[in-house]
């Protein structure tokens, strides 16, 4: 059995997907990171196998029937605007500088339902 955690990024913005994937691969090297440009792409895969779902605010709103039961595994990619403060769903401010973004990801890890044995802070370029 494969114990390697899998993480899904569901976001239509290619640069956001690639940037987040790169950061996650640095801080969670033991994880498999998959990107999807739409909710339908995720549904065509095996949607319940993921340890975490990083999703755009729009996808969360449009498909909250899927993500609400998985809110402990769901992280919404948005700004820190009060309108994005969702009940019980972590929000990652994607407009922060890289160093703060990485620190926010590490803080989210502390409250994650899945444990990663060793996360490291990458060198900020």
Say what each PLM segment does.
Residues 1-113:
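N-terminal regulatory/sensing modules of transcriptional regulators
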Residues 117-123:
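Conserved small/polar residues in nucleotide/adenosyl-binding loops
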């Amino acid at each position: 059995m494969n114990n390697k955690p899998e993480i899904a990024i569901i976001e239509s913005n290619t640069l956001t997907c690639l940037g987040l994937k790169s950061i996650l691969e640095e801080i969670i090297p033991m994880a498999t990171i998959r990107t999807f440009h739409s909710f339908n792409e995720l549904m065509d895969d095996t949607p319940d196998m993921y340890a975490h779902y990083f999703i755009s605010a729009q996808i969360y709103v449009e498909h909250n029937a899927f993500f609400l039961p998985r809110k402990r595994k769901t992280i919404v990619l948005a700004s820190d605007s009060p309108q994005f403060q969702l009940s019980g769903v972590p929000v990652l401010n994607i407009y922060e500088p890289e160093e703060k973004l990485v620190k926010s990801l590490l803080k989210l890890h502390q409250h994650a339902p899945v444990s990663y044995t060793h996360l490291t802070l990458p060198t900020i370029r």
